[in-house]
Amino acid sequence: MKKIILISFLLAFVLVNSAKAAVFKLPMDAVKEEFPDATEVEIKNVILTPEQVSEIGKLSKIKVKDRLISFYLGKKGSEILGFGVFDTHIVRTKPETFLLIIDKEGRVKDVKVIAFYEPLEYLPPQKWLNLMKGKELNDKLRLKVGMPSITGATMSSQAVVEAIRRNLAIYKVIFGENGK
């Protein structure tokens, strides 16, 4: 009987730990990888006004949860190469953090998952995240409209698409059409 209990406990421990989440990269390391030609990465903290929150909600059709936003500007001299923003949101019951890179025209340049605390089988694959590249804030940037959903990771894919819509709208309100 003790052996069965011990084996059951060990099996449960292995299963729980195999489904545990992961932190894939340190945030600044991820930003530096995305801007390899940058001579500096400037952090620009923005506190959104109520008017900006309202405008972002209208543009993205997604509720803004945080008013403090930090953008990471990859710069080479005085030239801005692109903009990075981290987004942490709840997928089902646990958080996911990804880094969204936005080009100067307001399009998605890249998306990288930094940390994922749900079971890893719910993690959107990088191949699917790569479908975001070149997307801009419009009605096609929606799950099942311009983006395929992921079987077995529908909530994860929905959370990512909504967060990208929200952050592209934040970018547009803060930096305008051409990142100025």
Language-model-detected regions and their locations in the chain:
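Positively charged n-region of N-terminal signal peptides that target proteins for export
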Residues: 1-4
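Bacterial N-terminal signal peptides
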Residues: 7-16
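Flexible, solvent-exposed loop/hinge segments and secondary-structure transition points
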Residues: 19-147, 154-158, 162-180
